[in-house]
Amino acid sequence: PLEEIIFFNFACSLYQGLNLIKKSNIWDFFDYNIEDIFQAWSAGCILQGDYINSISQKYKNYKNLNFEFLHSLIEEKCSKKFKLIREFNSNGIRSGLPCPVLSSNLAYYDLIFSNHKIGETIQLQRSFFGLHTIKNKKDDKKIKPYWTKL
């Protein structure tokens, strides 16, 4: 799954970078065209050029840097290997080999596409310390847990 790991990292990092560039266009002194950036970056190394060219083709179909674009990129190449990508990251960390880019990209991907958002985690921590009620997602029933007895 090494190729999928590299592609996953490349796609997530590229997507985040392109979004930063796109957002910078709100200021008058920046006026970047995403297609021009793809063209300039594709002149890099062969591997990078191949990845950028395939992502650039997909961008031409979408014409939008939205989450659907990122999801389609990763699903196409990595969906069947996602468990292995996570295991690779976990094994690296357990072995004392930091994988900061992969860890960060997995967290970014999960933040966007997971059913469990960071806000839920924060609320759970608030509930733990403040004993607030929580709502069960399955039946909308409110529960007032006493966390220290769980």
Over which residues does each language-model region extend?
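C-terminal substrate-binding/catalytic lobe of Rossmann-fold NAD(P)-dependent dehydrogenases
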Residues: P1-S95, C99
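C-terminal amphipathic alpha-helical interaction region
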Residues: S79, L84-L150
